[in-house]
């Protein structure tokens, strides 16, 4: 027997929302999904009229839905935003080269300018070459660090006011779990922020419009909207630490469907004792990009690769980082002595 749509629109329901349990027809689900994202944008004041916003586009379901919804809401509610696409090519054969075709499709569909930056262009390395050097045990460390900085570099090149990323509720809950398991108190609180960075701190802000959107609903939205997205998993991802947190979260969700939002809200309410030493975010003296250490992690990892010591910067506070920091200090001291001689 057909179940009527819970919004009393007169149509039959076709789904039960994973997030709320509401039975909705396709049209009402679309509207509810889009309205929730709009409300998040408004309540958190993520954008201001006239801003140039770069959408971090990978071609996957999250960034594809983000590009579609941002384009739709920008017109529906007259945000007055200048939307562009920013993609990073890590140099993973059979994965990123194919996903960039989907990004190009988004560019054509929504008429958004697209800028693609590659690891080869920025660092002189591709992930294929990096994995050949270090193996698959720590490859995600390199990729994550380089990708975060690449987005900052791309945002600066495109002269945007902020970067919108496709992080969804599942992603954030997984990150909370990972940081708890690692005992990383600094990142544990920051990972729940819907907006990070600021122009005052000379960093281009990043925002997460999909912060409260469930991954299951993003997939359903993309499927029923017939959006074209790239669904193949990264060939280097199976060994990622995040996979264990994801599996744990899925098990929790089976027992308690609200577990995802519960974990996010717990992270948001977390308060760290004043006696706990927190890293101070500044600017790397070598590359000029945001960092909480000198030199930044990207510079340490890159130096290791270039010197034939690919594991130089691996670890929470690696020997390599201490060595590079000491070299930086010695160079500054030498420069100071030379300056005094004149």
From Swiss-Prot:
Q: Which residues form the signal peptide?
A: none
Q: In which pathway does it act?
A: tRNA modification; 5-methoxycarbonylmethyl-2-thiouridine-tRNA biosynthesis
Q: Which Pfam families match?
A: ATP_bind_3 (PF01171), zn-ribbon_14 (PF16503)
Where in the cell?
Cytoplasm
Q: Which superkingdom, per the lineage? A: Eukaryota
Which class of enzymes does this protein belong to?
Answer: transferase
This protein's record includes keyword tRNA-binding: yes
Keyword match Zinc? no
NCBIfam families documented for this protein? TIGR00269 family protein
Entry protein name: Cytoplasmic tRNA 2-thiolation protein 1
């Amino acid at each position: 027997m057909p179940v009527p749509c819970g919004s009393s629109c007169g149509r039959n329901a076709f789904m039960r929302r994973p997030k709320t349990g509401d039975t909705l027809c396709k049209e009402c689900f679309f509207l509810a999904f889009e309205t929730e994202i709009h409300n998040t944008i408004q309540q958190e004041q993520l954008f201001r009229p006239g801003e140039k916003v770069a959408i971090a586009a990978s071609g996957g379901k999250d960034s594809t839905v983000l590009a579609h919804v941002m384009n739709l809401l920008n017109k529906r509610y007259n945000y007055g935003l200048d939307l562009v696409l920013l993609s990073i090519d890590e140099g993973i054969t059979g994965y990123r080269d194919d996903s960039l075709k989907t990004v190009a499709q988004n560019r054509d569909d929504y008429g958004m300018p697209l800028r693609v930056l590659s690891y080869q262009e920025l660092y002189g390395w591709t992930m294929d070459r990096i994995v050949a050097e270090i193996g698959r045990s720590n490859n995600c460390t390199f990729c994550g660090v380089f990708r975060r900085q690449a987005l900052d570099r791309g945002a600066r090149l495109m002269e945007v006011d902020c970067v919108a990323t496709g992080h969804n509720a599942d992603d954030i809950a997984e990150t909370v779990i990972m940081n708890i398991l690692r005992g990383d108190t600094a990142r544990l609180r920051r990972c729940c922020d819907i907006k990070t960075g600021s122009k005052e701190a000379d960093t281009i802000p990043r925002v997460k419009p999909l912060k409260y959107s469930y991954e299951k609903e993003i997939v359903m939205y993309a499927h029923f909207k017939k959006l074209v997205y790239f669904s193949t998993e990264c060939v280097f991802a199976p060994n990622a630490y995040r996979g264990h947190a994801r599996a744990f979260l899925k098990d929790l969700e089976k027992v308690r469907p609200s577990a995802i939002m519960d974990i996010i809200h717990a992270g948001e309410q977390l308060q760290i004792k004043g006696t706990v030493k927190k890293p101070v975010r500044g600017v790397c003296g070598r590359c000029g990009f945001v960092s909480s250490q000198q030199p930044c992690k990207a510079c340490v990892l890159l130096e290791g690769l270039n010197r034939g010591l690919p594991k130089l910067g691996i670890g929470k506070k690696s020997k390599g980082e201490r060595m590079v920091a000491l070299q930086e200090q010695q160079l500054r001291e030498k420069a100071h002595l030379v300056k005094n001689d004149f």
